[in-house]
From Swiss-Prot:
Name of the protein described by the UniProt record: Tetraacyldisaccharide 4'-kinase
GO molecular function, one term: tetraacyldisaccharide 4'-kinase activity
Species in which this protein is naturally found: Escherichia coli O139:H28 (strain E24377A / ETEC)
NCBIfam families hit by this protein: lpxK
A Pfam cross-reference name: LpxK
Residues that, per the record, bind ATP: 55-62
Enzyme nomenclature, EC number: 2.7.1.130
Length: 328
């Protein structure tokens, strides 16, 4: 229902307009206060790059963060990552991730990013505290990438990158809750790069596709082509589950059942195992896998995806960030 409201298919969005106007008024006032320096943002001693969204829901932001961190690491840059840690609850903040940190403590995305990149990752509702925690433990870090936080103006940033779902784009264009917007589309004029996940990019936008890898067994780490798996049940607890189901079909998999879950939904063995009958195979997202690995069954697999950016602009962006991190 929410997708129909946000896309404009359902007329119910009109009933929510008063709340959207209030949301837009408050969010605009907050940004204006920082722009006029009525509120002061904290500036880190190293460059900060924000990778965020204008809309609620999954746009492919986390794969972009992983891509960015890995690309900078390959260029010899030492990167730290900070996040709000949605879906997690730590005993105290800031929380610097370690090999023992769970998704219940830090949230799904920070654990995934930590496991994929081995970069220092810290979470805190106050992102500046997370930055300070990283720099205290890893003083050699040259640049900070913040996963989400475009609207977290308390942390000053040097580069802003926005990720857009190229198919859904901005829906009906209204602020939450009548539409999907955290900020209106005009905000794109002030950011440094716009990355479009799928669909048809517009002038000045960087095209991106999510490239699936081999399926990975949660218990053994064994890899195989996902099309080799039989009697598949697909599970996705991400911002936009249909994208994952479409990816499986693109890989030649016709799931016997597709199970969409809420983003950041808590998972346990009983609930997940109940999705699969004898002889079936469960295939989930990598984001779900970080929550399920501790209690996984032998027939549970995940399908990792990597961001693939096209054109000349990604190289220019990486050159800019490398120069920033190097102090040039």
């Amino acid at each position: 229902m929410i997708e129909k409201i946000w896309s404009g298919e359902s007329p119910l969005w009109r009933l929510l307009l008063p709340l959207s106007w209030l949301y837009g008024l408050v969010s605009g006032a907050i940004r204006l206060c920082y722009k006029l320096k009525l509120k002061r943002a904290w500036r880190a001693p190293v460059p900060v790059v924000v990778v965020g969204n204008l809309t609620a829901g999954g746009n492919g932001k986390t794969p972009v963060v992983v891509w960015l961190v890995e690309q900078l690491q390959q260029r010899g840059i030492r990167v730290g990552v900070v996040s709000r840690g949605y879906g997690g609850k730590a005993e105290s903040y800031p929380l610097l991730l370690s090999a023992d940190t769970t998704t219940a403590q830090a949230g799904d995305e920070p654990v995934l990013i930590y496991q994929r990149t081995d970069a220092p990752v810290a979470v805190s509702p106050v992102r500046s505290d997370a930055v300070k925690a990283i720099l205290a433990q890893h003083p050699d870090v040259q640049i900070i990438v913040t996963d989400d936080g475009l609207q977290h103006y308390r942390l000053a940033r040097d580069v802003e990158i926005v990720v857009i779902d190229g198919v859904r784009r901005f829906g009906n264009g209204w602020w939450l809750p009548a539409g999907p917007m955290r900020e209106r589309a005009g905000r794109l004029k002030s950011v440094d790069a716009v990355i479009v996940n799928g669909g048809v990019p517009r002038s000045g936008e960087i095209p991106m596709h999510l490239l699936p890898g081999q399926a990975v067994n949660l218990r053994t780490g064994t890899r195989c082509d996902v099309a080799q798996l039989e009697h598949v049940v697909a599970m996705a607890g991400i911002g936009h589950p249909p994208r994952f189901f479409a990816t499986l079909k693109m890989c030649g998999v016709q799931p016997e059942k597709c199970v969409p879950l809420a983003d950041h939904q808590s998972l346990n063995h009983a609930d997940v195992s109940a999705l699969v009958s004898t002889g079936q195979t469960l295939v989930m997202t990598e984001k779900d896998a970080v929550k399920c690995r501790a209690f996984a069954e032998e027939n549970w697999w995940y399908l990792p995806v990597d961001a693939q950016l096209s054109g000349d602009e990604p190289a220019k962006l990486l050159t800019q960030l490398t120069s920033l991190a190097s102090g040039n």
